[in-house]
Amino acid sequence: MRFVNESAKTVMECTYDYMGRRHTRKVSVNGTVSSYLRYMYRGYLQIAAIDAVSGAFRWFLFWDPTQPEAARPLAIRKDGTWYAYGWDLTKNVTEIFGKAGYLRTVYTYTPYGEVAAEGDVTQPIQWSSEYNDEELGLVYYNYRHLNPHDGRWISRDPI
């Protein structure tokens, strides 16, 4: 699948596996590849992103093992450091905590999920504990994207 943001001159190309999960995500800006990730899953839970060129882990997610389905992420390991998530009752990530419980990033949202972050830790899981495709301004819900600007899905629900 290919997404194009003409105003930002950004192209995102994704491949999917036989279960419909996103397998790779390559982002190019002005024709130069800026990010090329390969994803790992536990069932349908995205648990890690690996740099497809170097093979290095970009991040690793720890989900609540007591939940049968994806509920909320508990922590993320990024750049060799663990960070803990704080969320509200609708599963939106609202805070990222660093070592010793220090608040590192705070997230606020519009009613449909446009995000504003204040802090120094960037990470992909945000609105509704789903993946934020920052380059496109869309929220990835495993099978389709939500446009948080107007609260609409960009495609039909796959059957």
Which ranges hold each PLM region?
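Short non-domain terminal segments
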Residues: 1, 58-60, 125
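Beta-strand elements of repeat-based all-beta scaffolds
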Residues: 1-5, 11-15, 21-26, 44-52, ...
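Intrinsic-disorder/low-complexity regions
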Residues: 4, 16, 29, 50, ...
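Short, solvent-exposed loop/turn segments that connect beta-strands within catalytic domains
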Residues: 6-9, 30-34, 53-56, 66-70, ...
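Aromatic-rich beta-strand edge motifs centered on tyrosine
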Residues: 12-21, 36-45, 58-71, 83-91, ...
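A periodicity- and composition-biased signal for non-globular, repetitive helical segments
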Residues: 27-31, 150
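A motif-centric feature for acidic-aromatic and gly/ser/thr-rich catalytic loops and repeats
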Residues: 75-143, 148-150, 154
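Gly/Pro-rich loop segments of beta-rich domains
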Residues: 158-159
